[in-house]
Amino acid sequence: MRKCIACLLCLFFVVPVFSQTASTISEILEKDAASYLDFSYLIVAEAGMDSTPFEAYTWCERFGTFPLGDTPDSPITAKTVSHFLMKNYELGGGLMWSATQSPRYAWKEMKANGFWRKSFDPDRQLSGRETVQAVSKFFDENPDIVLREPPTAAASHDNRALLLQDKEEE
């Protein structure tokens, strides 16, 4: 009897969490141009954390690999995805990647390793479907990979104010 009650309780608490993730991912898949928010949400969801897309972006922004002029709603490019994955999952690469750690050489490394198609432009804005496929492919090819700790302990000042405002409204 206790096992049945425990199973029912788990069902009531676990299913809504997965349905929220599934609905968010479905929304991402339908987009013509995925944003930093979408990419960040996929990374954080893969890490097993539960968050909103903006909370995920704020967490990923702490790594310092997103371009400074871009906003959370800016379309994400293949070059930016490559740079985030190579730098923050501490993947090794060739001489130019090791020397510069630049987004362009991150993209070149991943393209040379077969991650991106040969005809893929580094500045191509990824659709939601392409972003989900890229993140899934990355974790399928690297099942034991671990994200490094963010070098910044807190969210940027602008994002911190927005997060606190959001919490006050709840």
Predicted regions mapped to residue ranges:
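Terminal recognition/anchoring or ligand-binding modules at protein termini
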Residues: 19-52, 66-170
